């Protein structure tokens, strides 16, 4: 039997797939919960429950998985619009602001989310927080030759930034764009995500950061109630 966290992720992934309609162009997110969603989508396509779906993936991992499941794919540049994007998050605050980028895919994830007519976030209950960045570091993608300079500028903004090192290779993590990632902890967490997103992205050498501000339309949360996995739809706090 799957552990409780996996059960929550499976429940919320299944709920997200129920929002998909025939003929949609879909943004297919990254991470463990999004992977379960892609698997559920593949099963519905294989059974004929869904038809004429086109996927736009946000990572190499998602592209490989979707292709293996027979989900038709296109590049972001080949579609005029995305009807629905479904993705996970590392943290979600009460105003539906997010931190993403634990898998270093946040640049493509943000491109897809911002293109979508509707962006639905799927998480388990451990990802819901009152304030961002108290429990999860903020990823900032930087040009390889600029990481030291950006590290210093982030310190001026009150952040401690460490270069993300790879687990299965010597040296740092390298993104799909060929860049490096700084993981940032802001003193006291992030009180104004919109302001900080702009400040960081204005630093020379920064490509993008993992704050997703004013993009999310709905948050589906997997939770356990009386030992049974279910789904709760969050209400946004304005």
Swiss-Prot record:
Q: Which organism is it from?
A: Prochlorococcus marinus (strain MIT 9313)
Q: Kindly state one GO CC term assigned in the UniProt record.
A: cytosol
What job does the chain carry out?
A: Catalyzes the reversible conversion of ribose-5-phosphate to ribulose 5-phosphate.
Subunit record text:
Homodimer.
- Annotated active site residues, numbered on this chain, are 109
- Name the keywords, alphabetized: Isomerase
Q: Which InterPro entries match?
A: NagB/RpiA_transferase-like (IPR037171), Ribose5P_isomerase_typA_subgr (IPR020672), Ribose5P_isomerase_type_A (IPR004788)
Metabolic or biological pathway, per its Swiss-Prot or TrEMBL entry? Carbohydrate degradation; pentose phosphate pathway; D-ribose 5-phosphate from D-ribulose 5-phosphate (non-oxidative stage): step 1/1
Residues annotated as binding substrate are 30-33, 87-90, 100-103, 127
Concerning SMART domains, the annotation shows: DeoRC
Q: Which CDD domains match?
A: RPI_A
- The protein, known as: Ribose-5-phosphate isomerase A
Which GO terms are recorded in the biological process aspect for this UniProt protein? Answer: D-ribose metabolic process; pentose-phosphate shunt, non-oxidative branch
Family that this chain belongs to: Belongs to the ribose 5-phosphate isomerase family.
Q: What is its EC number?
A: 5.3.1.6
The reactions it catalyses are: aldehydo-D-ribose 5-phosphate = D-ribulose 5-phosphate
Gene3D superfamilies named in the record: 3.30.70.260, 3.40.50.1360
Tell me one GO molecular function of this protein. ribose-5-phosphate isomerase activity
């Amino acid at each position: 039997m799957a552990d409780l966290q996996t059960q929550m992720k499976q429940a919320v992934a299944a709920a997200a797939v129920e929002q998909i309609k025939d003929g949609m162009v879909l943004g297919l997110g990254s991470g463990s919960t999004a992977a379960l969603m892609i698997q559920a989508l593949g099963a519905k396509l294989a059974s004929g429950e869904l038809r004429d779906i086109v996927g736009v993936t946000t990572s190499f991992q998602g592209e490989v998985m979707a292709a293996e499941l027979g989900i038709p794919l296109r590049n972001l540049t080949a579609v005029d619009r995305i009807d629905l994007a479904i993705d996970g998050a590392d943290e979600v605050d009460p105003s539906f602001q997010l931190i993403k980028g634990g898998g270093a895919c946040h640049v493509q994830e943000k491109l897809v989310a911002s293109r979508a007519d509707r962006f639905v976030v799927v998480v388990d209950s451990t990802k819901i927080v009152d304030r961002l960045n108290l429990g999860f570091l903020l990823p900032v993608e930087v040009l390889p030759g600029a990481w030291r300079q950006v590290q210093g500028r982030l310190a001026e903004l009150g952040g401690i930034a460490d270069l993300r090192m790879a687990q299965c290779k010597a040296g740092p993590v390298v993104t799909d764009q060929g860049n490096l990632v700084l993981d940032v902890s802001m003193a006291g967490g992030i009180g104004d995500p919109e302001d900080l997103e702009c400040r960081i992205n204005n630093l020379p050498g920064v490509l993008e950061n993992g704050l997703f501000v004013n993009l999310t339309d709905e948050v589906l949360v997997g939770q356990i109630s009386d030992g049974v996995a279910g789904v709760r739809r969050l209400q946004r706090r304005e």
